């Protein structure tokens, strides 16, 4: 139960759904966690009460805001003294519809949160890891199977998740070529049973999944334990698809 002992992880969108599942797995394995949310402040307070003030910190932040990133990283260092792991998990589904009907405002909001937020996270996490963690660490970008194939009625979401996939590749290669021991990988969930899945469509969704059921947040948490731990020291610039064989 100590695979992440003494590690400090920052998990955006970490107070509900997949993010909370990752946080629960990280706490179980001995990590200290900094959790963020833009709107769900009550969820953040509940998470800290559950995990303990000595092991967790909640920071309200907008991942698309550069100043919020600087503030959150500083609060992480002030509380725990270093940063070992960044999980870029926060995201939105965006507005559905064909590309010709999508407004620029709706497009930009999805890109700002899902892609620009990940860029800002990488930028400031790398700086902190270099300064406070001996230039060593792990960055995990939560993309989606929609980052591997296009969804016809979710063009902004698909673009943001595909962009996250290639941002992961570019950053991993850049750091490796610099001989900096900060690994960057992406995780691509399929359908995961969270509150955002419409109940009326559950049967239809499950019928498309070869294993016969949706995944759970813990399924993403477990792969993130591996990627955050020293066990994955040779995993870099890789894509981990967790979708019950849906895209096989």
Regions found by a protein language model. Give the residues of each.
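Short, small/polar-rich loop/turn modules that mediate ligand/substrate recognition or access, typified
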Residues: 176-183, 235-237
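Residue(s) in the substrate-gating loop at a strand-loop-helix junction
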Residues: 144
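Alpha-helical segment proximal to the catalytic Tyr-Lys
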Residues: 127, 173-177, 233
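Substrate-binding pocket helix/loop in short-chain dehydrogenase/reductase
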Residues: 97-99, 103-111, 205
């Amino acid at each position: 139960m100590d695979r992440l002992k003494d590690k400090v992880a920052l998990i955006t969108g970490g107070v509900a759904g997949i993010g909370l599942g990752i946080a629960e797995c990280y706490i179980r394995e001995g990590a200290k966690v900094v959790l963020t949310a833009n709107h769900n402040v009550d969820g953040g307070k509940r998470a800290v009460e559950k995990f303990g003030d000595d092991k967790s910190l909640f920071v309200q932040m907008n991942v698309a805001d550069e100043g919020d990133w600087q503030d959150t990283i500083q609060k992480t260092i002030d509380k725990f003294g270093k940063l070992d792991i960044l999980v870029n998990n926060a995201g939105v589904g965006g507005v559905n519809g064909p590309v010709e009907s999508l407004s620029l405002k709706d497009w930009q909001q999805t890109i700002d949160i899902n892609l620009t937020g990940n860029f800002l996270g990488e930028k400031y996490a790398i700086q902190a890891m270099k300064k406070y963690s001996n230039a060593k660490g792990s960055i995990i970008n939560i993309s989606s199977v929609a980052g591997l194939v296009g969804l016809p009625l979710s063009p902004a979401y698909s673009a943001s998740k595909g962009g996250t996939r290639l941002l992961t590749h570019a950053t991993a290669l850049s750091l490796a070529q610099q001989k900096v021991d900060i690994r960057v990988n992406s995780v691509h969930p399929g359908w995961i049973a969270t509150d955002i899945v419409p109940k009326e469509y559950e049967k239809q969704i499950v019928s498309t999944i070869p294993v016969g059921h949706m995944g759970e947040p813990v399924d993403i948490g477990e792969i993130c334990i591996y990627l955050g731990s020293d066990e994955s020291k040779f995993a870099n610039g890789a894509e981990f698809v967790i979708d019950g064989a849906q895209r096989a």
